């Protein structure tokens, strides 16, 4: 059986997400990742309501994951990411941090 990894973090790190998606997929992991990258805030239909919907969807992805990876380039974590991380910890999911090099353990 494949382990499911959920990547969480600010979508301003899209290139890091993409690199992790590829490298972890090639190692045999199933990946949940942001599917909407709208850091600039200019995508049509991506207002406050969409952000709330995406936050709920991310928590559902965490519920179905075996491992959560926080994509925290240079240690940066916004409020949404902190809430998602706390949700994972509440569920006793292993949480690894990109900034600490912990992803290499996968």
Region roles according to the model:
Residues 1-106:
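Conserved catalytic or regulatory cores that recognize and/or transform ribose-phosphate-containing ligands
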